[in-house]
């Protein structure tokens, strides 16, 4: 069985210089874990939603010069891809791992989803755990901690999703390398489930 939890070696992959060299390290160290997570949590999400979920490990095929600074496995209801749909992600940067649900700029249903989120704005503010974080750009590691946001701040991020063509919105958790050093494989898998649970109602709002 492939160990799915991330180690210091996995995070250090993002210090490897050169596109080919870093991609080789990603494929050797991280992709087997993402594949294992993909199989397990595609099944989990399918059971939770009564829909068929498929997993997609990032290939970084468009990169010709610069090596990737993060990598991930994404989960959607389309066999061919995920970027055009609301989706879940598990992945890592050199500084942290992440577990997200969200919509990125390629998704054509951002406007409808933003309106649904705004209708349930107070519920989102109340029901998203305080230690969760919000990202408005999946290509950058910066986030906003949920407990520091006023309802108006959350409203502005959601409205931006509807009005700005390249806008994105993702929500979930970060896990530091230090946290992983004290975390068993079973604890990591349980952490993923406990993170996805409060995000499933957001997925349901996307599919009303």
From Swiss-Prot:
This is UPF0637 protein BcerKBAB4_3786. InterPro entries: UPF0637, UPF0637_domain_sf. Belongs to the UPF0637 family. It comes from the Bacteria. Signal peptide: none annotated.
């Amino acid at each position: 069985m492939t160990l799915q939890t991330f180690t210091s070696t996995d995070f250090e992959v993002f210090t490897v210089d050169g596109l080919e060299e870093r991609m080789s390290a990603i494929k050797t160290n991280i992709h087997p874990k993402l594949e294992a997570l993909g199989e397990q949590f595609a099944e989990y999400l399918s059971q939770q939603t009564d829909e068929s979920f498929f997993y997609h490990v990032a290939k970084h095929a468009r990169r010709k010069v610069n090596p990737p600074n993060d990598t991930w496995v994404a989960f959607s209801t389309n066999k061919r891809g995920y970027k055009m749909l609301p989706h879940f992600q598990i992945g890592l940067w050199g500084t942290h791992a992440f577990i997200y649900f969200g919509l990125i700029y390629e998704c054509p249903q951002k406007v409808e989803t933003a309106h649904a989120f705004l209708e349930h704005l107070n519920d989102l503010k109340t029901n998203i755990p305080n230690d969760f974080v919000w990202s408005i750009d999946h290509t950058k590691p910066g986030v906003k901690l949920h407990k520091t946001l006023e309802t108006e701040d959350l409203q502005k991020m959601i409205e931006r999703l509807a009005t700005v063509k390249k806008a994105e919105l993702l929500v979930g958790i970060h896990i530091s390398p230090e946290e992983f050093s004290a975390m068993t494989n079973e604890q990591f898998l349980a952490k993923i489930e406990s993170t996805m649970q409060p995000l499933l109602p957001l997925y349901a709002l996307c599919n009303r």
